A protein has these predicted regions:
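C-terminal module of multi-pass small-molecule transporters
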Residues: 18-19, 66, 77-87, 103-104, ...
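Transmembrane-helix bundle of Major Facilitator Superfamily
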Residues: 2-188, 345, 349, 353, ...
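Short helix-loop-helix connector
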Residues: 100, 116, 132-133, 289-290, ...
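A gly/Pro-rich, aromatic-decorated transmembrane alpha-helix motif that marks the paired
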Residues: 146, 150-166, 214, 218, ...
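Small-residue-rich transmembrane alpha-helices and their cytosolic helix-loop interfaces
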Residues: 24, 60, 141-149, 153, ...
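Hydrophobic transmembrane-helix bundles of small-molecule transporters
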Residues: 164-300
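Transmembrane core module of solute transporters
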Residues: 13-62, 252-260, 278-407, 415-417
Length: 493
């Protein structure tokens, strides 16, 4: 006897949630692991810290510039298909990242890995939202957020153990067997979404959007530590021994006027806006942003939330290891207080969030996050470990109040056929915020440091670093306060 349709749908929604969460777990796990092994990568490749950090930055740039495009592409051609494709690309990128013999190879394969991660992340929340009825979406999204932050919490500790015992390359190889096991499961368990065959891809808009964001992020990342007139990039040699010692440049140098990249970013942005208003099926529906106040505000609050706090774990990690001389493994477990707090509190938020509007929860989360950043701005060389842990826990509580209600309100404010696009736009704001946060944090701290810190083995001034760290957290506090007001003025429907 066949099962009633209601039972089938009930089983499918939970199966979907489990399968999507397990597959999506790999991307944030990788992000958390890689952030911890950057010093080892710099040491092995004999490259400067300012270059090695691009192993993380370039990953975020790809996510930022392509998530919206991939969201529209998945709306047109099917979300399940490109969720599976994304998992496959992520596995391939992970394998070759582990095989990299130069920093150039690693950066190239991190781009490939990030393309796969973008396809996974842009479709995950849309697939979950499609599977659940409106009254259960907050709970489903809270579980999804819990899984993501469980991965982030696991990443640093797992990365520290793997690096210490079997080497940093294995943090990339870890994704390969897990991904290969998941591929047939995802393919067989998920249903394909309805396809919007009457829509076309906006490739021109994608190009100008990616160009504008890339120019902006490069300018912020490199500009403050360079001269007041130009950004100077020196490339002695880039080669790929894996592919027969192919040489791209030899003793090549380029000097970019400091104002050129921001100006190019503005020009590309203006062209992008013009293109989007004329496009039949734009990747960024500016009309939807202008007509849907809830959709606009949820995107803006996400941008301000992640810009304000995302650099905290990276900055505190360096503080613990360089200033307090704490072992990397111990530091990793200390840092896990933040994501573990999100894991513990997110389920409770999802269960009781029906009693409070997403507007109030988002604003409260931003406010609590702002308090934690204000506390961190008082950090000194002699601050107790308890002070740091309490600050991270408060930040985790703030993010848990924000992380599920905000995307749920965002995706519920659009029609089903636009949910991958909406999730892509929200993901773009999230990753743009993360990229800006890292760039602002590194630039602020860099202004307080001498030049030799950017070289492997360079010395560091304790007072200079902590002074820059405090200023970076205070800037984050100001950004969070602005985000509170944006959250409060939005509508609930």
């Amino acid at each position: 006897m066949s099962k009633p349709l209601s039972n089938y749908l009930s089983e499918y929604k939970w199966t979907t949630l489990i399968v999507v969460n397990i597959a999506t777990f790999l991307a944030p796990l990788d992000t958390g692991i890689v952030a911890l092994v950057l010093p080892n990568i710099a040491r092995d490749f004999q490259t400067g810290i300012d270059i090695a950090i691009w192993v993380s930055v370039i990953y975020l740039i790809v996510l930022t510039t392509f998530m919206t495009s991939f969201g529209r592409f998945s709306d047109i051609h099917g979300r399940k298909k490109y969720f599976v494709v994304g998992l496959g690309i992520f596995v391939i990128g992970s394998f070759f990242s582990g095989m990299s013999q130069t920093i150039a190879e690693l950066l190239i394969f991190r781009i490939i890995q990030a393309i796969g991660a973008a396809l996974l992340l842009v479709n995950s929340r849309a697939i979950i939202t499609d599977a659940f009825p409106p009254e259960e979406r907050r709970l489903a999204m809270s579980i999804h957020v819990t899984v993501i932050y469980l991965a982030i919490a696991t990443g640093p500790a797992l990365g520290a153990v793997i690096t210490e015992y079997i080497g940093w390359r294995n943090v990339f190889f870890l994704n390969v067997p897990l991904g290969l096991v998941l591929l047939p499961i995802v393919s067989s368990k998920l249903k394909e979404s309805a396809k919007s065959l009457n829509k076309s891809m906006d490739w021109l808009g994608s190009f100008f959007f990616a160009s504008s964001l890339s120019c902006l992020l490069i300018a912020i990342t490199f500009g403050p530590k360079e001269s007041l007139t130009s950004i100077d990039l020196y490339i002695e040699e880039i080669f790929l021994p894996m592919f027969g010692n192919i040489h791209f440049w030899s003793r090549f140098a380029i000097s970019i006027p400091l104002l050129l990249l921001p100006l190019l970013s503005l020009v590309f942005l203006i062209i992008f806006v013009i293109v989007e208003y004329k496009a039949k099926n734009p990747i960024l529906d500016l009309r939807m942003l202008s007509k849907n106040r809830l959709f606009l505000s949820t995107n803006l609050t996400a941008l301000f939330m992640y810009t304000s706090h995302y650099n905290a774990l990276v900055m505190i990690s360096f503080y613990l290891q360089l200033i307090r001389l704490i072992d990397p493994t111990e530091a990793a477990f200390m840092l896990s207080a933040f994501p573990l707090t999100v894991v513990v509190t997110s389920i409770a938020v999802g269960k009781y969030s029906k009693l409070v509007s997403s507007r109030e929860l988002s604003a409260l989360g931003m406010a609590i996050g702002a308090i934690s950043l204000l506390l961190m701005s008082r950090l000194t060389v002699t601050s107790s470990v308890l002070f740091i842990e309490v600050s991270l826990i408060i930040m985790g509580i703030g993010l848990s109040l924000f992380a599920a209600p905000n995307p749920n309100a965002n995706l519920s404010s659009v029609t089903s056929e636009d949910r991958s696009l909406a999730n892509g736009m929200l993901g773009t704001m999230r990753h743009l915020g993360q990229s800006l946060s890292l760039a602002i944090g590194a630039s602020t701290v860099g202004l307080f440091l001498s030049e030799d810190i950017y070289s492997v083995g360079g010395s560091i001034s304790v007072v200079e670093y902590v002074g820059g760290l405090s200023q970076a957290f205070f800037i984050g506090f100001i950004i969070a306060v602005i985000g509170i007001f944006i959250a409060l003025i939005r509508g609930n429907k």
